[in-house]
């Protein structure tokens, strides 16, 4: 059993799992008032909820139990892992991969090709429950092809450059603007250039090349 609300457009060759809800009206909107689009070849696995007002590209995939709120722009070839939460008014570019149990708050921007590891938490309010908190909601911006390791926490209004690697368990408290670097620690600091990484198993000389973004 699944529920597809009014004004939902789903492309060709879609696979929609059991107990999926697509087009859930956000508070203050009626069924079908907002258009919701998913491109071709999407795979939406069981118990996922996609609210109305989303624009989602081709080859989109979810794990199980994903929650995607309203008014997001999601590009082509994006995947969102099991039990991850995507809040509203978020921009996710092409070829972004979001692992399981990730939290992405409103007004975040994930640029093309970035990878977000499991249990990563982005935040968007510096002082929760402050009387003015709603006036300064600012999500993080993750640069093109940047990899964010497991259990990283990123504070509000942070920008991370492109082709970076943020080490597992890091706490990002300030902008990491230099492209092509490894950052790690609590708080996260610059460790080395991405080309200086080596494989401990001698399987490859350089784990990451300097990737160019189309």
Predicted regions and their residues:
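Structural signal for interior beta-strand "rungs" in well-ordered beta-sheet cores
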Residues: 2-184, 190
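C-terminal end-helix/capping segment
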Residues: 186-199
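ABC ATPase nucleotide-binding domains
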Residues: 200, 204-214
């Amino acid at each position: 059993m699944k529920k597809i609300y009014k004004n939902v457009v789903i492309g060709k060759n879609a696979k929609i799992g059991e107990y999926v809800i697509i087009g859930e009206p956000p508070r203050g909107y009626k069924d079908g008032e907002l258009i919701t689009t998913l491109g071709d070849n999407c795979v939406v696995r069981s118990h996922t909820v996609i609210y109305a007002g989303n624009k989602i590209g081709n080859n989109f995939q979810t794990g199980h139990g994903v929650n995607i709120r309203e008014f997001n722009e999601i590009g082509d070839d994006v995947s969102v892992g099991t039990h991850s939460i995507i809040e509203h008014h978020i921009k996710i570019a092409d070829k972004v991969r979001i692992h399981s149990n990730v939290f992405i708050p409103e007004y975040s921007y994930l640029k093309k090709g970035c990878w977000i590891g499991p249990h990563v938490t982005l935040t968007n309010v510096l002082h929760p429950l402050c009387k003015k908190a709603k006036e300064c909601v600012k999500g993080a911006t993750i640069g093109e092809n940047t990899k964010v390791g497991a259990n990283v926490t990123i504070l509000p209004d942070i920008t991370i450059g492109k082709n970076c690697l943020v080490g597992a368990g890091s706490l990002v408290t300030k902008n990491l603007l230099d492209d092509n670097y490894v950052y790690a620690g609590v708080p996260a600091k610059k460790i080395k250039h991405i080309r200086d990484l080596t494989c401990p198993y001698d399987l490859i000389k350089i784990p990451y090349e300097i990737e160019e973004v189309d």
